[in-house]
Amino acid sequence: MGEKKNEGDNKKKGGDNKKKNETPSITVVLKVDMHCEGCASRIVKCVRSFQGVETVKSESATGKLTVTGALDPVKLREKLEEKTKKKVDLVSPQPKKEKEKENKNKNDEDKKKSEEKKKPDNNDKKPKETPVTTAVLKLNFHCQGCIGKIQKTVTKTKGVNGLTMDKEKNLLTVKGTMDVKKLVEILSEKLKRAVEIVPPKKEKDKENGNENGEKKKGGGGDGGGKEKTGNKGGGEGVNMMEYMAAQPAYGYGYYPGGPYGYPIQAHAPQIFSDENPNACVVM
């Protein structure tokens, strides 16, 4: 009887030790850049190869990767970064050390703020607040991965408050106190494509209005010049008819020649002839 009791106690102890050694399954949420379905399938295969992984779900649109199983989330993140050579963010659960660091940083920031408030301001002048601007950018959206990359780069830039995307027109509207030129440079470097700043409609309307005004002013000046030239002639200038005077023509005129004739044989005049009895006599 004593031996049977000892065997039962040993079995219970062994079962308790197994339960203690087994780590409970947890849900780990990671954030990775997944450009397309091919990238997502590769990352899922890589995660499934790790020990303790039970299920893996990927969302390529948001770059979210959900993993369940008995595993260490920090080690999983580090190994995934090594294999994929991409930045992997651990959304949940956060390790205790990182939480403690965040709490310390928050406390330090609060202390600094309180000290700054206590210090007297040497300059009473307040710094000028940068105005909130709205910039419209034009660039090509190739696929869902490109859209996610654009959203990530824009949200990381300093001073951006919000953004909206128009996929049909390929327009990106950004609101905030950021430097638009720097934002354009960052996007063109990371995406390796042309990014244009679309000017607002008001500026275009003003430019068109100025051009029309200049044309009207120029036409009025010409009309004024014509009126001045007409007034110099007085009242006669109004009723004066304009005509083109014909230039004098110089030509070489020849009289028409007579018809061609033949010599006619006629008798010589008999007025002073001696043979004519009726002729005149010169004394």
Curated annotation (Swiss-Prot):
InterPro entries from the UniProt entry: HIPP01/3/5/6 (IPR044594), HMA_dom (IPR006121), HMA_dom_sf (IPR036163)
Lipid anchor positions (S-farnesyl cysteine): 280
Keywords: Cytoplasm, Lipoprotein, Metal-binding, Methylation, Nucleus, Prenylation, Repeat, Zinc
Propeptide: 281-283
Feature: compositional bias, Basic and acidic residues: 1-22, 82-129, 198-230
Domain of life: Eukaryota
GO annotation terms (biological process): negative regulation of flower development
UniProt entry tagged with the keyword Repeat: yes
Main localization (coarse): nucleus
Residues that coordinate or bind Zn(2+) 2: 143, 146
Tagged with keyword Ribosomal protein: no
Induction data: Induced by infection with the bacterial pathogen P.syringae pv. tomato DC3000. Repressed in response to drought and abscisic acid (ABA).
Localization: Nucleus; Nucleus, Nucleolus; Cytoplasm
Region (Disordered): 1-26, 82-131, 198-238
Residues annotated for Zn(2+) 1 binding in this entry: 36, 39
Modified residues (Cysteine methyl ester): 280
Domain annotation HMA: ranges: 25-88, 132-195
CDD domains, per the entry: HMA
Pfam families in alphabetical order: HMA
Function: Heavy-metal-binding protein. Binds high amounts of zinc. May act as an upstream regulator of the salicylate-dependent pathogen response. Involved in abiotic stress responses, and seed and flower development.
Similarity field: Belongs to the HIPP family.
Other facts: Plants over-expressing HIPP3 show delayed growth of inflorescence.
Name by which UniProt lists this protein: Heavy metal-associated isoprenylated plant protein 3
